[in-house]
A protein has these predicted regions:
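Hydrophobic anchor at the start of a short beta-strand
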Residues: 39-40, 47, 58, 107, ...
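Fold-independent oxyanion-binding glycine-rich loops
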Residues: 43-45, 62-64, 113-114, 139, ...
């Protein structure tokens, strides 16, 4: 049987930045091939394992890739550290141990590529297209780091570009023009003053946020700019559709918009509903439950009618940071909680 903590240590030594997951996928496939209970299928750098069983059909999903960063791996007492320790090689290792346990449920496990980059390359989406029936399951758990709590649903996310107009002039005579950067400052202030909605959904509280994440404006060092572009990211609760979120954003920005300004929604995806139905045993085993702040592939699964939660080892606040560390006890605890639920 695979032991998750030892496997996580090995996985941390295998670089797997997005689009470079072949080595880690090969490694996991080789480790699982000796288990006679598993039926394995490979598509590109994505791996699917199936275990027949009874009761509701469950899917566990975890991505193999990491963001770019330093490959230093370290171990300090009761923690493992390194790029991807939290996001999400600890969760990937936990899945591997669960796959070798004696379980009662009908189980599908998916290790997939390219989660950290553009959605068009996401391995889970590519698998769903290449393997009809893969998502014919009743429940799903995405093993994103959750600090050992079950996180229900996920937020939707919307990115909008706001273009503000000004009037160009020489910087020695700024009163002859209208500075689009000054207008942008007013818009950013408006963005920062949004009162976030905090709806209670499925018994947990979601907190929305709106942030300015990028700004551009330049003509020349001696020119008052006549345009400025600001990109905003709105993380909205899953009770709103992307269309409703876009309408709310536009309504909030309206007081600082003028004729000739434009707001373009460049990307918007729905969140996943917060539901505990079917996951009560997992919540009991984990010991705590809360809302998922952020978007995960639970949202993608929800669009296919699959209720999904997030549950994995590691503090999500450490993801993508140079200080990624995960407690060995948290990895083992994740395995035991999943195994307890799936054995029932």
């Amino acid at each position: 049987m695979i032991e998750a903590v030892a496997l996580a240590r090995e996985l941390l030594r295998i670089p797997s930045v997005s689009r470079d997951e072949r080595a880690i996928c090969d490694f996991i496939e080789e480790r699982l091939q000796g288990d006679g209970e598993l039926s394995l299928a490979r598509f590109e750098n994505n791996l699917v394992a199936r275990i027949p069983g009874s009761g509701p059909r469950v899917l566990l999903a975890g991505h193999l890739d990491t963001v770019p960063g330093e490959d230093r791996v370290f171990e300090d007492g009761e923690v493992l550290g390194g790029l991807g320790a939290v996001d999400m090689k600890a969760g990937v290792a936990a899945m591997c141990e669960v796959a070798t346990r004696d379980l009662a449920r009908d189980l599908t496990l998916v290790w997939y590529s390219c989660e950290e980059i553009d959605a068009s390359e996401n391995g889970l989406r590519r698998l769903a297209g290449a393997m009809p029936g893969l998502l014919n399951v009743d429940l799903a758990v995405v093993l994103e780091p959750s600090g050992g709590a079950v996180e229900l649903g996920c937020q939707g996310t919307l990115r909008a570009k706001v273009e503000l107009r000004g009037r160009r002039a020489h910087s020695a005579r700024p009163w002859m023009g209208r500075n689009a950067i000054s207008r942008a400052a007013s818009l950013v202030d408006r963005v920062d003053r949004l009162e976030p909605r905090r709806p209670i959904l499925g018994g947990v509280e979601f907190k929305e946020s709106l942030s300015a994440v990028r700004i551009e404006s330049f003509v020349a060092n001696n020119v008052i700019p006549d345009s400025a572009r600001i990109w905003c990211n709105y993380r909205f609760a899953p009770d709103l559709s992307p269309e409703e979120a876009a309408a709310r954003l536009l309504d909030w920005l309206q007081p600082v918009l003028e004729e000739g300004d434009t707001v373009t929604v460049e990307d918007a995806v729905a969140g996943a509903p917060a539901t505990m139905s079917g996951f009560e045993g997992l919540v009991a085993a984990a010991g705590s439950v809360r809302a998922k702040l952020g978007w995960t592939d639970a949202g993608f699964l929800a669009t296919h009618g699959v209720p999904a939660v997030n549950f994995g080892p590691g503090d999500p606040l450490l993801a993508h940071s140079p200080g990624e560390v995960v407690a060995k006890a948290e990895i083992a605890g994740c395995v035991e909680a999943l195994a307890s639920w799936l054995a029932s």
